[in-house]
Amino acid sequence: MKHKVKHIHFVGVGGSGMSGIAEVLAHLDFTVTGSDLAASATTRRLEGEGVKVTVGHAAENIAGADAVVISTAVKADNPEVIAARERKIPVVPRAQMLAELMRLKSGIAIAGTHGKTTTTSLVTSILAEGGIDPTFVIGGRLNAAGANARLGSGDFLVAEADESDASFLFLSPVISVVTNIDADHMETYGHDFERLKSAFVDFLNRLPFYGVAVVCGDDANIRDILPRVPKQIITYGLSNECNFHAENIVADNGQMRFDCVRVNGTTSRLSITLNTPGMHNVLNALAAIAVATEVQVSDAAIVKALAEFKGVGRRFQRYGEVALPAGGSFTLVDDYGHHPVEMAATLAAARGAFPGRRLVLAFQPHRYTRTRDCFEDFVKVLSTVDALCLAEIYAAGEAPIVAADGRSLARALRVSGKVEPVFVEDIAAMPQTIMDVARDGDVVLCMGAGSIGAVPGKVAEFK
């Protein structure tokens, strides 16, 4: 690529999926520029890595570029995209540029509806502890590295594979992980769940003849597609039928302890302490152990990396204690969860990590389409908390849908009679609402994929 392309411009460079690729390309000595609607901690970090970032979109921003990279969030009427097409500059989807990076290394791609970011981070952490020094591109900030991407000197590139827009079908990894298959982003697949499952079949069948599929054997939808995947398959899960499975699972003060039994020619079992809570994270760790075993990371490195795992930004991220004006304090936790299935897993993890304490949820639904498609499931999972601060929908560019907004969700919750939501019209009011609702000894969990991500930092600043 480098003999033809020297200057690469990213439209929306501050996005989680875009910034990591831009950072790795900058370290590969490409000239990298980018634009975004607003400056952020991410754009400032990129500038520190040598990426020139412009706030705002304008045709002149792409001057000198040999290629322009866009995500699916960038519309065709963006002035930089229009200018690139007029000048015959290639406009490249983000996933296609990630695929080009993966051609330089042996790719490990982690796909699935839930758990991609944490599993990618766990795989990266174990490989790094094992001395492999992987390149990684993650959708969240790996706390141990202080970044969501890094160019490593080793042979492997570890990356998330995104099914939301079917862009994971650009990738050609040598190891593919599928954590689960659930109904989300269904508009991409014409609201046809079988089409979604078929996309995962196509993803796994992109493996070379020597490639390996690491999949969750507990997931019924994954089991359903395996007969259509004529590749080497390694399963993980809680079932004893899985090649890698967990036994003797104990939740202990925000950690998970378990024995990993490996039925793959490796007879030794591993005694694991995972430094993050939740049964869902036991599954994520099993996936990472399976990948690490496949690439011959030592048992000692696997055990050490999981015990010392520092987590991922906005994945059960603990902000510590926040003092209340009237005295006492509450524990503040932040999480990216925005689908009912992953929310239920995170809420269960919170109950396990903080037994006996009142759980307050501050939640901002993400997208009208998801709220419509999962409405009853949202009502069910939101009804399990002790107190609820419910924000209006974060649209993510979507037009409103009748009866799929925040107020409709609040009304349905009141009718259910299990929780009385405090509705927050403007997300800017959420920090004060949390301070008004929280009591001494509470656990306050902020959740959502939209602008609620800025709320915990503001709550933590209250004095």
Curated annotation (Swiss-Prot):
SUPFAM superfamilies: MurCD N-terminal domain, MurD-like peptide ligases, catalytic domain, MurD-like peptide ligases, peptide-binding domain. Keywords: ATP-binding, Cell cycle, Cell division, Cell shape, Cell wall biogenesis/degradation, Cytoplasm, Ligase, Nucleotide-binding, Peptidoglycan synthesis. GO terms for biological process: cell division; cell wall organization; peptidoglycan biosynthetic process; regulation of cell shape. Its main location: cytoplasm. It holds the Pfam family Mur_ligase_C. It catalyses: UDP-N-acetyl-alpha-D-muramate + L-alanine + ATP = UDP-N-acetyl-alpha-D-muramoyl-L-alanine + ADP + phosphate + H(+). Its EC number is 6.3.2.8. It is an enzyme of class 6 (ligase). It is found in: Cytoplasm. Pathway: Cell wall biogenesis; peptidoglycan biosynthesis. One of its GO terms (molecular function) is ATP binding. ATP binds at residues 112-118. GO terms for cellular component: cytoplasm. The keyword Nucleotide-binding applies. The keyword Cell division applies. Belongs to the MurCDEF family. PANTHER family: UDP-N-ACETYLMURAMATE--L-ALANINE LIGASE, UDP-N-ACETYLMURAMATE--L-ALANINE LIGASE-RELATED. NCBIfam families: murC (TIGR01082). Cell wall formation. This is UDP-N-acetylmuramate--L-alanine ligase. It comes from Dechloromonas aromatica (strain RCB). The lineage of its organism: Bacteria, Pseudomonadati, Pseudomonadota, Betaproteobacteria, Rhodocyclales.
